[in-house]
Design a protein with these regions (language model features):
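Chitinase-like catalytic core of GlcNAc-active glycosidases
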Residues: 57-58, 89
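Acidic/histidine-rich helix-loop elements
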Residues: 44-54
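Active-site region of glycoside hydrolase catalytic domains
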Residues: 1-46, 89-91, 100-119, 124-507
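Surface-exposed loop and membrane-interface regions of Gram-negative outer-membrane beta-barrel proteins
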Residues: 52, 86-91
Protein backbone atom coordinates (compact mmCIF):
# COMPACT_ATOMS: atom_id res chain seq x y z
CA UNK A 1 0.00 0.00 0.00
CA UNK A 2 1.10 3.58 -0.57
CA UNK A 3 3.07 5.35 2.12
CA UNK A 4 0.25 7.89 2.43
CA UNK A 5 -2.30 5.19 3.29
CA UNK A 6 -3.93 5.89 6.63
CA UNK A 7 -3.90 3.23 9.31
CA UNK A 8 -5.98 4.16 12.31
CA UNK A 9 -8.60 3.46 14.92
CA UNK A 10 -12.04 5.00 15.38
CA UNK A 11 -13.98 6.06 18.45
CA UNK A 12 -17.00 8.16 19.41
CA UNK A 13 -17.47 10.52 22.32
CA UNK A 14 -20.49 9.03 24.06
CA UNK A 15 -19.16 5.48 23.86
CA UNK A 16 -15.70 6.24 25.20
CA UNK A 17 -15.50 9.44 27.21
CA UNK A 18 -17.29 8.96 30.52
CA UNK A 19 -16.27 6.84 33.49
CA UNK A 20 -14.00 8.93 35.70
CA UNK A 21 -13.96 7.95 39.35
CA UNK A 22 -15.77 11.01 40.68
CA UNK A 23 -18.18 11.58 37.76
CA UNK A 24 -16.66 14.98 37.06
CA UNK A 25 -16.94 14.71 33.29
CA UNK A 26 -20.49 13.58 32.69
CA UNK A 27 -22.40 14.64 29.61
CA UNK A 28 -25.96 14.75 30.90
CA UNK A 29 -27.36 16.93 28.11
CA UNK A 30 -27.51 14.40 25.28
CA UNK A 31 -30.44 12.39 24.00
CA UNK A 32 -28.66 9.08 24.57
CA UNK A 33 -27.85 9.95 28.20
CA UNK A 34 -31.57 10.15 28.94
CA UNK A 35 -32.53 7.27 26.66
CA UNK A 36 -30.41 4.58 28.31
CA UNK A 37 -31.78 5.31 31.81
CA UNK A 38 -35.44 5.77 30.90
CA UNK A 39 -37.65 3.51 33.11
CA UNK A 40 -39.87 2.47 30.20
CA UNK A 41 -36.87 1.37 28.13
CA UNK A 42 -35.41 -0.49 31.09
CA UNK A 43 -38.68 -2.26 31.84
CA UNK A 44 -39.05 -3.35 28.21
CA UNK A 45 -35.36 -4.40 28.18
CA UNK A 46 -34.74 -2.21 25.14
CA UNK A 47 -31.52 -1.06 26.80
CA UNK A 48 -29.00 -3.02 28.84
CA UNK A 49 -29.11 -1.15 32.13
CA UNK A 50 -25.40 -0.38 31.80
CA UNK A 51 -24.73 3.34 32.08
CA UNK A 52 -22.12 5.38 30.19
CA UNK A 53 -20.78 6.94 33.39
CA UNK A 54 -19.44 3.47 34.20
CA UNK A 55 -17.34 3.59 31.03
CA UNK A 56 -13.68 3.60 30.10
CA UNK A 57 -12.87 7.26 30.96
CA UNK A 58 -11.23 8.28 27.70
CA UNK A 59 -12.08 11.86 28.71
CA UNK A 60 -9.22 11.81 31.23
CA UNK A 61 -7.19 8.94 29.81
CA UNK A 62 -6.99 10.16 26.21
CA UNK A 63 -3.19 10.70 26.47
CA UNK A 64 -2.82 7.01 27.36
CA UNK A 65 -5.09 5.89 24.53
CA UNK A 66 -3.28 8.12 22.05
CA UNK A 67 0.06 6.67 23.16
CA UNK A 68 -1.26 3.13 22.76
CA UNK A 69 -2.33 3.97 19.22
CA UNK A 70 1.08 5.48 18.55
CA UNK A 71 2.83 2.35 19.85
CA UNK A 72 0.84 0.38 17.27
CA UNK A 73 2.45 2.47 14.56
CA UNK A 74 -0.81 4.09 13.50
CA UNK A 75 -0.78 7.39 11.63
CA UNK A 76 -4.47 8.37 11.88
CA UNK A 77 -7.17 8.70 14.52
CA UNK A 78 -10.91 9.13 13.99
CA UNK A 79 -13.21 10.69 16.60
CA UNK A 80 -16.11 13.07 17.09
CA UNK A 81 -16.68 16.00 19.43
CA UNK A 82 -19.90 15.80 21.40
CA UNK A 83 -22.36 18.47 20.26
CA UNK A 84 -24.09 18.38 23.66
CA UNK A 85 -20.82 19.09 25.48
CA UNK A 86 -19.91 22.10 23.38
CA UNK A 87 -23.45 23.48 23.23
CA UNK A 88 -25.38 22.12 26.23
CA UNK A 89 -27.84 25.00 25.79
CA UNK A 90 -29.77 25.85 22.60
CA UNK A 91 -28.21 27.80 19.75
CA UNK A 92 -31.60 28.84 18.37
CA UNK A 93 -31.07 32.38 19.62
CA UNK A 94 -28.11 32.87 17.31
CA UNK A 95 -30.04 33.96 14.25
CA UNK A 96 -28.79 33.33 10.71
CA UNK A 97 -30.10 34.30 7.31
CA UNK A 98 -31.01 31.41 5.06
CA UNK A 99 -32.56 30.81 1.66
CA UNK A 100 -34.99 28.12 0.52
CA UNK A 101 -35.09 26.59 -2.94
CA UNK A 102 -38.24 25.84 -4.94
CA UNK A 103 -38.58 22.46 -3.21
CA UNK A 104 -38.53 23.94 0.27
CA UNK A 105 -34.99 22.77 1.00
CA UNK A 106 -32.46 25.07 2.63
CA UNK A 107 -30.19 26.24 -0.17
CA UNK A 108 -27.93 28.61 1.72
CA UNK A 109 -27.11 29.47 5.33
CA UNK A 110 -25.20 32.67 5.95
CA UNK A 111 -22.65 32.26 8.73
CA UNK A 112 -20.82 35.49 9.58
CA UNK A 113 -18.09 36.50 12.00
CA UNK A 114 -20.84 37.90 14.20
CA UNK A 115 -22.53 34.48 14.12
CA UNK A 116 -19.33 32.87 15.34
CA UNK A 117 -18.88 35.50 18.04
CA UNK A 118 -22.39 34.84 19.35
CA UNK A 119 -21.87 31.08 19.25
CA UNK A 120 -18.60 31.48 21.11
CA UNK A 121 -20.38 33.39 23.86
CA UNK A 122 -22.72 30.48 24.61
CA UNK A 123 -20.32 27.60 23.97
CA UNK A 124 -19.05 25.65 26.98
CA UNK A 125 -15.49 26.98 27.16
CA UNK A 126 -14.31 24.18 29.41
CA UNK A 127 -15.29 21.62 26.77
CA UNK A 128 -13.80 23.69 23.94
CA UNK A 129 -10.59 23.87 25.97
CA UNK A 130 -10.67 20.12 26.63
CA UNK A 131 -11.22 19.16 22.99
CA UNK A 132 -8.48 21.57 21.91
CA UNK A 133 -6.09 19.63 24.13
CA UNK A 134 -7.33 16.29 22.77
CA UNK A 135 -6.81 17.29 19.15
CA UNK A 136 -3.52 19.06 19.86
CA UNK A 137 -2.18 15.93 21.52
CA UNK A 138 -3.07 13.86 18.46
CA UNK A 139 -1.29 16.32 16.18
CA UNK A 140 1.79 16.41 18.43
CA UNK A 141 2.00 12.63 18.14
CA UNK A 142 1.89 12.87 14.36
CA UNK A 143 -1.63 11.58 13.71
CA UNK A 144 -3.83 12.64 10.85
CA UNK A 145 -7.07 13.66 12.54
CA UNK A 146 -10.39 12.56 11.05
CA UNK A 147 -13.14 14.49 12.81
CA UNK A 148 -16.84 13.64 12.61
CA UNK A 149 -19.39 16.26 13.64
CA UNK A 150 -21.90 13.85 15.15
CA UNK A 151 -21.95 10.13 15.91
CA UNK A 152 -25.59 9.25 16.73
CA UNK A 153 -25.91 11.63 19.69
CA UNK A 154 -27.62 15.04 19.84
CA UNK A 155 -28.17 17.74 22.43
CA UNK A 156 -31.33 17.23 24.42
CA UNK A 157 -32.54 20.67 23.36
CA UNK A 158 -32.53 19.43 19.75
CA UNK A 159 -33.87 15.93 20.34
CA UNK A 160 -35.72 14.77 23.43
CA UNK A 161 -36.08 11.03 22.78
CA UNK A 162 -38.62 10.41 25.53
CA UNK A 163 -40.92 13.22 24.38
CA UNK A 164 -40.44 12.09 20.79
CA UNK A 165 -41.38 8.52 21.66
CA UNK A 166 -44.38 9.47 23.78
CA UNK A 167 -45.78 11.88 21.16
CA UNK A 168 -44.78 9.79 18.11
CA UNK A 169 -42.55 12.68 16.98
CA UNK A 170 -45.22 15.35 17.26
CA UNK A 171 -43.15 17.32 19.79
CA UNK A 172 -40.93 20.33 19.09
CA UNK A 173 -37.63 18.74 20.11
CA UNK A 174 -37.92 15.97 17.53
CA UNK A 175 -34.42 16.00 16.06
CA UNK A 176 -34.05 15.56 12.33
CA UNK A 177 -37.78 15.66 11.71
CA UNK A 178 -37.51 19.43 12.16
CA UNK A 179 -35.97 21.49 9.39
CA UNK A 180 -34.57 23.89 11.96
CA UNK A 181 -32.07 21.15 12.84
CA UNK A 182 -30.45 21.82 9.46
CA UNK A 183 -29.72 25.39 10.55
CA UNK A 184 -28.43 24.36 13.98
CA UNK A 185 -26.16 21.75 12.42
CA UNK A 186 -24.72 24.32 10.02
CA UNK A 187 -23.95 26.60 12.98
CA UNK A 188 -22.29 23.73 14.84
CA UNK A 189 -20.21 22.81 11.79
CA UNK A 190 -19.09 26.40 11.28
CA UNK A 191 -18.12 26.75 14.92
CA UNK A 192 -16.04 23.56 14.91
CA UNK A 193 -14.26 24.63 11.73
CA UNK A 194 -13.62 28.05 13.27
CA UNK A 195 -12.28 26.63 16.54
CA UNK A 196 -10.59 23.42 15.47
CA UNK A 197 -10.00 23.64 11.72
CA UNK A 198 -6.23 24.01 12.11
CA UNK A 199 -6.16 20.69 13.98
CA UNK A 200 -8.28 18.62 11.56
CA UNK A 201 -7.08 16.85 8.42
CA UNK A 202 -10.28 15.13 7.30
CA UNK A 203 -13.88 16.09 8.08
CA UNK A 204 -17.03 13.98 8.15
CA UNK A 205 -20.47 15.37 8.84
CA UNK A 206 -22.38 12.28 10.01
CA UNK A 207 -21.51 8.78 11.07
CA UNK A 208 -24.05 6.27 9.71
CA UNK A 209 -27.01 8.66 9.62
CA UNK A 210 -29.33 6.06 8.12
CA UNK A 211 -28.82 3.87 11.18
CA UNK A 212 -30.34 6.63 13.31
CA UNK A 213 -33.37 6.79 11.04
CA UNK A 214 -33.87 3.08 10.36
CA UNK A 215 -33.51 1.98 13.97
CA UNK A 216 -34.98 5.05 15.63
CA UNK A 217 -37.98 5.75 13.41
CA UNK A 218 -38.83 2.35 11.91
CA UNK A 219 -37.66 -0.32 14.38
CA UNK A 220 -39.16 0.31 17.84
CA UNK A 221 -37.48 -2.68 19.47
CA UNK A 222 -33.96 -1.87 18.27
CA UNK A 223 -33.03 0.05 21.40
CA UNK A 224 -32.31 3.21 19.40
CA UNK A 225 -34.07 6.48 20.20
CA UNK A 226 -36.79 7.52 19.86
CA UNK A 227 -38.11 3.98 19.30
CA UNK A 228 -41.17 4.71 17.18
CA UNK A 229 -42.70 3.55 13.91
CA UNK A 230 -43.39 6.62 11.82
CA UNK A 231 -42.51 6.19 8.13
CA UNK A 232 -43.57 9.69 7.13
CA UNK A 233 -41.40 11.27 9.79
CA UNK A 234 -38.56 8.96 8.77
CA UNK A 235 -38.73 10.30 5.22
CA UNK A 236 -38.69 13.87 6.49
CA UNK A 237 -35.68 13.10 8.67
CA UNK A 238 -33.74 11.56 5.78
CA UNK A 239 -34.33 14.60 3.58
CA UNK A 240 -33.30 16.93 6.39
CA UNK A 241 -30.14 14.92 7.09
CA UNK A 242 -29.14 15.10 3.43
CA UNK A 243 -29.84 18.83 3.45
CA UNK A 244 -27.93 19.23 6.73
CA UNK A 245 -24.84 17.54 5.33
CA UNK A 246 -24.75 19.91 2.36
CA UNK A 247 -25.14 23.02 4.50
CA UNK A 248 -22.59 21.77 7.03
CA UNK A 249 -20.21 21.16 4.12
CA UNK A 250 -20.61 24.78 3.03
CA UNK A 251 -20.19 26.01 6.60
CA UNK A 252 -16.93 24.11 7.07
CA UNK A 253 -15.63 25.13 3.67
CA UNK A 254 -16.20 28.80 4.54
CA UNK A 255 -13.51 28.55 7.20
CA UNK A 256 -11.50 25.52 6.08
CA UNK A 257 -10.57 25.77 2.41
CA UNK A 258 -8.58 22.59 1.82
CA UNK A 259 -9.41 19.69 4.13
CA UNK A 260 -11.67 17.13 2.42
CA UNK A 261 -15.23 16.79 3.73
CA UNK A 262 -17.16 13.54 3.52
CA UNK A 263 -19.80 11.41 5.17
CA UNK A 264 -19.61 7.94 6.74
CA UNK A 265 -22.28 5.58 5.41
CA UNK A 266 -23.31 2.13 6.55
CA UNK A 267 -24.01 -1.01 4.52
CA UNK A 268 -22.75 0.33 1.21
CA UNK A 269 -23.11 -2.49 -1.31
CA UNK A 270 -23.29 -5.19 1.35
CA UNK A 271 -26.64 -6.79 0.46
CA UNK A 272 -26.90 -10.16 -1.27
CA UNK A 273 -29.95 -11.90 -2.74
CA UNK A 274 -31.00 -15.12 -1.02
CA UNK A 275 -31.42 -16.66 -4.47
CA UNK A 276 -28.95 -15.03 -6.90
CA UNK A 277 -30.98 -16.42 -9.80
CA UNK A 278 -34.29 -14.93 -8.65
CA UNK A 279 -34.96 -11.47 -10.17
CA UNK A 280 -37.18 -10.58 -7.22
CA UNK A 281 -34.44 -11.34 -4.70
CA UNK A 282 -31.91 -9.46 -6.81
CA UNK A 283 -34.23 -6.46 -6.80
CA UNK A 284 -34.65 -6.81 -3.03
CA UNK A 285 -30.88 -6.64 -2.54
CA UNK A 286 -30.69 -3.55 -4.74
CA UNK A 287 -33.46 -1.90 -2.72
CA UNK A 288 -31.71 -2.76 0.54
CA UNK A 289 -28.49 -1.12 -0.59
CA UNK A 290 -30.33 1.92 -1.91
CA UNK A 291 -32.27 2.34 1.32
CA UNK A 292 -29.21 2.00 3.56
CA UNK A 293 -26.86 4.23 1.60
CA UNK A 294 -27.63 4.72 -2.08
CA UNK A 295 -30.35 7.32 -1.60
CA UNK A 296 -27.98 9.37 0.53
CA UNK A 297 -24.89 9.05 -1.66
CA UNK A 298 -26.77 9.61 -4.91
CA UNK A 299 -28.02 12.95 -3.61
CA UNK A 300 -24.65 14.09 -2.27
CA UNK A 301 -22.53 13.06 -5.27
CA UNK A 302 -24.90 13.75 -8.16
CA UNK A 303 -27.52 16.11 -6.80
CA UNK A 304 -30.24 13.55 -7.57
CA UNK A 305 -32.77 13.41 -4.74
CA UNK A 306 -35.12 10.42 -4.79
CA UNK A 307 -38.16 12.18 -3.35
CA UNK A 308 -40.54 9.22 -3.63
CA UNK A 309 -38.13 6.69 -2.07
CA UNK A 310 -38.69 4.37 -5.01
CA UNK A 311 -35.25 4.31 -6.74
CA UNK A 312 -36.78 6.07 -9.75
CA UNK A 313 -38.43 9.43 -9.07
CA UNK A 314 -35.66 12.00 -8.63
CA UNK A 315 -35.37 15.74 -8.75
CA UNK A 316 -32.21 17.68 -9.51
CA UNK A 317 -30.95 19.61 -6.51
CA UNK A 318 -27.47 20.90 -7.40
CA UNK A 319 -26.87 22.52 -4.02
CA UNK A 320 -26.93 19.05 -2.38
CA UNK A 321 -23.94 17.95 -4.46
CA UNK A 322 -21.35 18.38 -1.74
CA UNK A 323 -18.97 15.49 -1.08
CA UNK A 324 -15.21 14.98 -1.32
CA UNK A 325 -14.91 11.43 0.00
CA UNK A 326 -17.02 8.49 1.13
CA UNK A 327 -16.48 6.66 4.38
CA UNK A 328 -17.78 3.13 4.73
CA UNK A 329 -18.32 1.03 7.81
CA UNK A 330 -18.20 -2.70 7.36
CA UNK A 331 -18.90 -5.41 9.92
CA UNK A 332 -20.87 -8.01 7.97
CA UNK A 333 -23.19 -8.51 5.03
CA UNK A 334 -26.96 -8.79 4.66
CA UNK A 335 -28.75 -11.61 2.85
CA UNK A 336 -32.25 -10.59 1.83
CA UNK A 337 -35.28 -11.86 0.00
CA UNK A 338 -38.20 -10.10 -1.64
CA UNK A 339 -41.23 -9.04 0.38
CA UNK A 340 -43.97 -6.49 0.13
CA UNK A 341 -42.75 -3.10 1.37
CA UNK A 342 -42.76 -3.05 5.15
CA UNK A 343 -43.88 0.55 4.90
CA UNK A 344 -46.03 1.46 1.86
CA UNK A 345 -44.92 5.08 2.26
CA UNK A 346 -41.35 3.89 1.60
CA UNK A 347 -41.46 1.61 -1.49
CA UNK A 348 -37.76 0.69 -1.19
CA UNK A 349 -38.49 -1.30 1.98
CA UNK A 350 -39.57 -4.29 -0.14
CA UNK A 351 -36.99 -6.64 1.35
CA UNK A 352 -36.64 -8.95 4.32
CA UNK A 353 -33.49 -10.22 5.99
CA UNK A 354 -32.82 -13.96 5.98
CA UNK A 355 -31.88 -15.43 9.39
CA UNK A 356 -28.62 -17.34 9.58
CA UNK A 357 -26.55 -14.84 7.61
CA UNK A 358 -24.98 -11.46 8.18
CA UNK A 359 -26.30 -9.68 11.25
CA UNK A 360 -28.88 -12.39 12.04
CA UNK A 361 -26.91 -15.36 13.34
CA UNK A 362 -26.68 -17.25 16.64
CA UNK A 363 -23.68 -15.85 18.56
CA UNK A 364 -20.42 -17.82 18.51
CA UNK A 365 -21.68 -20.48 16.13
CA UNK A 366 -21.46 -20.82 12.34
CA UNK A 367 -23.60 -19.07 9.79
CA UNK A 368 -25.63 -21.07 7.28
CA UNK A 369 -22.72 -20.69 4.88
CA UNK A 370 -20.27 -22.01 7.46
CA UNK A 371 -18.62 -18.73 8.40
CA UNK A 372 -17.74 -17.97 12.04
CA UNK A 373 -20.02 -15.69 14.02
CA UNK A 374 -19.04 -13.08 16.61
CA UNK A 375 -20.22 -12.60 20.20
CA UNK A 376 -22.83 -10.22 18.80
CA UNK A 377 -24.22 -12.72 16.30
CA UNK A 378 -22.59 -11.08 13.27
CA UNK A 379 -21.23 -13.32 10.55
CA UNK A 380 -17.57 -12.83 9.64
CA UNK A 381 -17.77 -12.33 5.89
CA UNK A 382 -14.58 -10.58 4.72
CA UNK A 383 -15.41 -10.79 1.02
CA UNK A 384 -18.10 -8.20 1.63
CA UNK A 385 -15.65 -5.38 2.30
CA UNK A 386 -14.37 -5.66 -1.28
CA UNK A 387 -17.91 -5.35 -2.61
CA UNK A 388 -18.57 -2.41 -0.31
CA UNK A 389 -15.48 -0.59 -1.57
CA UNK A 390 -16.48 -1.36 -5.14
CA UNK A 391 -20.01 -0.03 -4.61
CA UNK A 392 -18.79 3.14 -2.89
CA UNK A 393 -16.24 3.74 -5.66
CA UNK A 394 -19.00 3.90 -8.24
CA UNK A 395 -19.83 7.37 -6.94
CA UNK A 396 -16.46 8.64 -8.15
CA UNK A 397 -15.00 9.64 -4.78
CA UNK A 398 -12.07 8.36 -2.72
CA UNK A 399 -13.05 5.74 -0.14
CA UNK A 400 -11.98 5.34 3.48
CA UNK A 401 -12.87 2.31 5.59
CA UNK A 402 -13.87 4.22 8.72
CA UNK A 403 -15.03 1.32 10.89
CA UNK A 404 -14.28 -2.39 10.76
CA UNK A 405 -14.15 -4.63 13.79
CA UNK A 406 -15.63 -7.51 15.73
CA UNK A 407 -17.16 -8.23 19.14
CA UNK A 408 -14.81 -10.97 20.33
CA UNK A 409 -14.08 -10.96 24.05
CA UNK A 410 -11.73 -13.96 23.90
CA UNK A 411 -9.82 -12.69 20.85
CA UNK A 412 -10.36 -15.95 19.00
CA UNK A 413 -11.58 -14.50 15.70
CA UNK A 414 -10.21 -10.95 15.68
CA UNK A 415 -6.72 -11.75 14.34
CA UNK A 416 -8.25 -13.60 11.38
CA UNK A 417 -10.91 -10.90 11.05
CA UNK A 418 -8.31 -8.16 10.68
CA UNK A 419 -6.06 -10.11 8.33
CA UNK A 420 -8.86 -11.31 6.06
CA UNK A 421 -10.46 -7.89 5.71
CA UNK A 422 -7.13 -6.22 4.98
CA UNK A 423 -6.56 -8.90 2.33
CA UNK A 424 -9.72 -7.81 0.53
CA UNK A 425 -8.75 -4.15 0.87
CA UNK A 426 -5.45 -5.01 -0.82
CA UNK A 427 -7.41 -6.76 -3.56
CA UNK A 428 -9.55 -3.64 -3.98
CA UNK A 429 -6.42 -1.53 -4.37
CA UNK A 430 -5.05 -3.98 -6.92
CA UNK A 431 -8.34 -3.63 -8.81
CA UNK A 432 -7.73 0.10 -9.09
CA UNK A 433 -10.15 1.39 -6.45
CA UNK A 434 -9.06 4.55 -4.65
CA UNK A 435 -8.99 3.36 -1.04
CA UNK A 436 -7.08 5.75 1.19
CA UNK A 437 -7.39 4.45 4.73
CA UNK A 438 -8.43 1.76 7.19
CA UNK A 439 -9.66 2.57 10.70
CA UNK A 440 -10.21 -0.33 13.07
CA UNK A 441 -13.09 -0.27 15.53
CA UNK A 442 -11.81 -0.04 18.16
CA UNK A 443 -8.66 0.60 20.12
CA UNK A 444 -10.41 -0.25 23.39
CA UNK A 445 -13.62 -1.82 24.59
CA UNK A 446 -16.41 0.70 24.91
CA UNK A 447 -20.13 1.31 25.43
CA UNK A 448 -22.02 -0.42 22.64
CA UNK A 449 -25.14 1.75 22.73
CA UNK A 450 -28.27 -0.12 23.86
CA UNK A 451 -26.18 -3.25 24.53
CA UNK A 452 -23.95 -1.53 27.05
CA UNK A 453 -20.56 -3.03 27.85
CA UNK A 454 -21.31 -6.65 26.98
CA UNK A 455 -19.86 -6.52 23.48
CA UNK A 456 -16.08 -6.20 23.47
CA UNK A 457 -14.65 -4.67 20.30
CA UNK A 458 -11.28 -3.49 21.61
CA UNK A 459 -7.75 -4.34 20.64
CA UNK A 460 -7.34 -3.60 24.33
CA UNK A 461 -9.81 -4.96 26.84
CA UNK A 462 -10.73 -2.59 29.65
CA UNK A 463 -11.21 -3.43 33.31
CA UNK A 464 -14.36 -1.42 33.98
CA UNK A 465 -13.45 -1.01 37.66
CA UNK A 466 -9.81 0.10 37.40
CA UNK A 467 -10.04 1.36 33.78
CA UNK A 468 -6.80 -0.48 33.05
CA UNK A 469 -6.16 -1.21 29.37
CA UNK A 470 -5.18 -4.86 28.91
CA UNK A 471 -3.74 -5.93 25.55
CA UNK A 472 -5.39 -8.56 23.41
CA UNK A 473 -1.94 -9.58 22.33
CA UNK A 474 -2.55 -11.63 19.23
CA UNK A 475 -4.79 -9.06 17.54
CA UNK A 476 -2.40 -6.27 18.46
CA UNK A 477 0.51 -8.20 17.00
CA UNK A 478 -1.34 -8.83 13.76
CA UNK A 479 -2.46 -5.24 13.31
CA UNK A 480 0.97 -3.87 14.30
CA UNK A 481 2.71 -6.13 11.80
CA UNK A 482 0.31 -5.09 9.04
CA UNK A 483 0.83 -1.40 9.80
CA UNK A 484 4.62 -1.68 10.05
CA UNK A 485 4.81 -3.43 6.69
CA UNK A 486 2.12 -1.45 4.90
CA UNK A 487 0.03 -4.55 4.34
CA UNK A 488 -0.08 -8.29 4.87
CA UNK A 489 3.15 -10.15 5.45
CA UNK A 490 3.87 -13.69 4.34
CA UNK A 491 3.67 -14.81 7.96
CA UNK A 492 0.18 -13.40 8.40
CA UNK A 493 -0.96 -14.87 5.10
CA UNK A 494 0.44 -18.25 6.08
CA UNK A 495 -0.87 -18.34 9.65
CA UNK A 496 -4.26 -16.65 9.33
CA UNK A 497 -5.63 -16.60 5.82
CA UNK A 498 -7.48 -19.57 4.52
CA UNK A 499 -8.48 -20.39 8.10
CA UNK A 500 -12.01 -19.27 9.03
CA UNK A 501 -11.82 -19.88 12.74
CA UNK A 502 -9.84 -21.68 15.40
CA UNK A 503 -10.82 -23.65 18.46
CA UNK A 504 -10.18 -22.11 21.85
CA UNK A 505 -7.47 -24.58 22.88
CA UNK A 506 -5.58 -22.33 25.25
CA UNK A 507 -8.05 -20.02 27.01
Amino acid sequence: MKKEFLWGVSQSGFQFEMGDRFNRNLDTRSDWWHWVRDPVNLKKELVSGDLPEEGINNYELYPLDHSLAKELGLNAYSLNLEWSRIFPCPTYGVEVDYELDGNGLIKRVKITKETLRELDEIANKNEVYHYTHVLTNLKKLGFKVALTLTHYTHPLWLHDPIESRDTNLQNERNGWVSQRSVLEFAKFAAYLAYKFGHLVDIWATFNEPMVMVELGYLAPYSGFPPGVVNPQRAKEAIINIINAHARAYDAIREFEKEAPIGIIANNVGTSYPKDPNDPEDIKAAQMTDFFHSGLLLQALTRGDLNIEFDMETTIKVPHLKRLDWIGITYYSREVVTHSEPKFPEIPITGFRGVPGYGYSCPPNELSKDGYPVSDLGWEVYPEGIYNSIKAASEYGKPVYVMENGIADSKDLLRPYFIASHVAYIERALESGFDVRGYFHWALTDNYEWAMGFRMRFGLYSVDMITKERLPRKESLEVYREIVENGGLTERIKREYLGVRGREDDSR
